[in-house]
Amino acid sequence: MSDIIKDAEKKMGSAVDHAREEFAAIRTGRANPAMFNKLMVEYYGTPTPLQQLASFQVPEARTVLIAPFDKSCVNDVEKAIRDSDLGVNPSNDGNVVRCVLPALTEERRKEYIKMAKTKAEEGRIAVRNVRRASNDVVKKQEKDKEISEDEMTRLEKELDQVTRKYVEQIDELLKSKESELLEI
């Protein structure tokens, strides 16, 4: 396998991983600490990722307990969650922040599915952009007589197969997220 294909697969794999992370951040009916991954907390004047400041527990299906390592920032964590667009109402008992997720309405589910489809399309576009960049490299090599025309055609076909494989992975992630969102 050529270096161009290996490099393209690596980049496409990271595009799929990014899509997976984006899907994890979309709220479903169940509690999932990953929904707090992108949340930044103002900690001593510096925006800090929440997962660096606290541990997470899921004691019940729709409850997340967030226990800050530094108890002095409990109010900051609560404020960051309240100000976010996660749609949860945090309560704080001085030591931990408890987030009870409300049941998703049909309208909210459809909104999240639409968001998931948008994230999937962004992932597909990223994969196709990698293919385009790799194809450009292959064509340049053929133009510079580093590879033959037959080799160029073979590499382009191989890139198309690799692209299809990674786009299908994103489609599977989307399908799984949609079924998770439609679960009641």
Swiss-Prot record:
One of its GO terms (cellular component) is cytoplasm. Responsible for the release of ribosomes from messenger RNA at the termination of protein biosynthesis. May increase the efficiency of translation by recycling ribosomes from one round of translation to another. NCBIfam families: frr (TIGR00496). Keywords: Cytoplasm, Protein biosynthesis. Belongs to the RRF family. This is Ribosome-recycling factor. HAMAP family: RRF. Its main location: cytoplasm. It is found in: Cytoplasm. GO terms for biological process: translational termination. GO terms for molecular function: ribosomal large subunit binding.
